């Protein structure tokens, strides 16, 4: 009877291990997909930031456009 209990426990552990391996693989696929999506979003954010900076003129005049201070 103890052998049956031991075999049942071993079968239960093997079953749990199999389900855990499947879950780990599914999570790995999900994490990998999220990493790729985040990389795309970072690229889009960088491009949008560059476009925004290029479309908005700076309120600070360049050194050549600045008038000299009054003490010159």
Swiss-Prot record:
Residues 55-65 have a biased composition (Polar residues). It comes from the Bacteria. Residues 52-72 are annotated as: Disordered. InterPro entries: SlyX. Belongs to the SlyX family. NCBIfam families: PRK02793.1. This is Protein SlyX.
């Amino acid at each position: 009877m103890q052998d049956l209990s031991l075999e049942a426990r071993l079968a239960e552990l093997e079953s749990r291990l199999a389900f855990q391996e499947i879950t780990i693989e599914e999570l790995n696929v999900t994490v990998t997909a999220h990493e790729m999506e985040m990389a795309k979003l970072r690229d889009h954010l960088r491009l949008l930031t560059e476009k925004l900076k290029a479309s908005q003129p700076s309120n600070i005049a360049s050194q050549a456009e600045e008038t000299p201070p009054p003490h010159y």
